Amino acid sequence: MSKRTFQPNNRRRAKTHGFRLRMRTRAGRAILASRRGKGRASLSA
């Protein structure tokens, strides 16, 4: 039997999909801008 692929880890989640990571690149800032435009309740992990 193989284990489940999703092994929750808050630190890894923040480091790979977090707000500060999104702000780091131009593309990431574009993602945040589009999510703000859509009116998302949460912008990032």
UniProtKB/Swiss-Prot annotation:
Keywords: Ribonucleoprotein, Ribosomal protein
GO BP terms, alphabetized: translation
Pfam families cross-referenced by the UniProt entry: Ribosomal_L34
One annotated GO molecular function: structural constituent of ribosome
Cited InterPro entries: Ribosomal_bL34 (IPR000271), Ribosomal_bL34_CS (IPR020939)
Annotated Gene3D superfamilies: 1.10.287.3980
Family: Belongs to the bacterial ribosomal protein bL34 family.
Protein's name according to its UniProt entry: Large ribosomal subunit protein bL34
Highest classification ranks of the organism: Bacteria, Bacillati, Actinomycetota, Actinomycetes, Kitasatosporales
